Amino acid sequence: MADIKTKDGEMNTYIFHPERNGPHPIVIFYMDAPGVREELCNMCRRIASAGYYVMLPNMFYRRTRAFDFEPRRAHDPAYAGRLQEMWLNVRSLSPDLVAEDTRAMLALASEDPAAGKGKIGVVGHCMSGRYAFAMAGRFPDRVGAAARFYGARYIAPEEKDSPHLAAKQIKGEMYFGFAQFDEYASDAMIEELRVFLKENNVKAEIEMYPQAHHGFAFPGRAAHHVASAERHWERLFDMWRRNL
């Protein structure tokens, strides 16, 4: 783990990569709202084992060095305080802040001989899907592939730094994977995104995952759907092979 210095403090970031045959293309894995946990570390290890230099930052470092929420207890009254804390953490973030953090991660990686110097991949699930989208536009010369799964609020006109505002700068390939059943991603929202991407000539694919629910890719979730999770991995690795 590395403590990456930013203007707001130290961002504790887990780094995974193969021991041999570097340098390896960089993939930034932006966490979801429950925070950095072993489940995400294992997903990053899977990516690293395929030949990538993976960075998993604690995006809530401005508020806490460690936050781990158990999604299965989200409706437990005894867990209400923890749930409230999670939403406070989520609301503390913005595309501008995540861009600052991404810049700091890339600066650190530039000094690591194990990290590649070319195009990078970014991936976000749920909360961080919008940040993966935003970073593709903020760092168009670095992000070769950006993927998001069951995210929301990609187009938020009321926000001065909404993810969609930098879409015209995107040069890399985009992928959006949505669950068939997801209260956070309505059909209308997905269609609005589809039209927006086409109108702005963004190279993107939007795919629906039948029978899947929000959170399907996470093995520790009740919503885990094996077939959809494996398809999600197939799409990620295929896109990275083409672009990184």
Which sequence ranges carry the predicted segments?
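N-terminal cap/leader regions of alpha/beta-hydrolase-fold enzymes
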Residues: M1-L244
